[in-house]
């Protein structure tokens, strides 16, 4: 009898992984984080570092000051994200590409290891992460890049279809060949 495979964690579906962290924030740093999050929401230039990673499908930070029925000693930061591949690779990118952003966001928290290197950060995340209770991914077998490429091809096919109504056969042939060349990077 063949051994059964171990169950997959609830935060993995297809090639996607969800990561949820719930970490305390030191009181004296709460106003700085509130300001930083407000600025990132209202001035998108502050999001450019996190948005450079094309493997991220979703990312959100929330400051939690209270919970119904619970007296919290600290405000907490709830971090939620989903991305292509294992979380360890995701954290490598954070630790080495945007370490200042990571230190600003979590560096004022308790026992934060201040990357780089990535290994202490991974250990800290492993201690502070929570398995997702609910996790949804519309295209679990597709990477973020695949989904973005498919959306771009769909947009270009739509433009070609609109143009086709007014083009003659030779013009359409030329437009179709341009479409194939232009869309090639997304196929």
Task: Tell what function each PLM region has.
Residues 84-119:
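An amphipathic, aromatic/His-enriched active-site/gating alpha helix that lines ligand/cofactor pockets
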Residues 1-57, 66, 73-76, 82-89, ...:
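Short S/T/G/P-rich N-terminal loop/turn motif that feeds into the first structured element of a domain
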Residues 63:
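Short beta-strand
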């Amino acid at each position: 009898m063949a051994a059964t495979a171990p169950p997959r964690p609830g935060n993995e579906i297809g090639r996607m992984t969800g990561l949820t962290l719930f970490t305390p924030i030191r009181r004296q740093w709460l106003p700085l984080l509130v300001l930083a999050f407000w600025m990132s929401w209202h001035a998108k230039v502050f999001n450019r570092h996190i948005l450079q990673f094309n493997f991220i499908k979703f990312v959100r930070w929330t400051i939690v000051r209270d919970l119904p029925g619970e007296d919290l000693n600290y405000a907490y930061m709830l971090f939620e994200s989903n991305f292509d591949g294992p979380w360890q690779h995701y954290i490598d990118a954070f630790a080495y590409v945007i370490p200042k952003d990571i230190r600003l966001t979590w560096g004022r928290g308790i026992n934060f290891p201040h990357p780089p290197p990535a290994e202490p950060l991974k250990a800290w995340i492993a201690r502070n992460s929570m398995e997702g209770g609910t996790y949804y991914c519309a295209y679990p077998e597709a990477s973020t890049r695949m989904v973005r490429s498919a959306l771009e091809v769909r947009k270009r096919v739509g433009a070609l279809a609109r143009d086709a109504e007014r083009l003659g056969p030779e013009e359409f042939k030329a437009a179709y060949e341009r479409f194939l060349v232009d869309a090639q990077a997304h196929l």
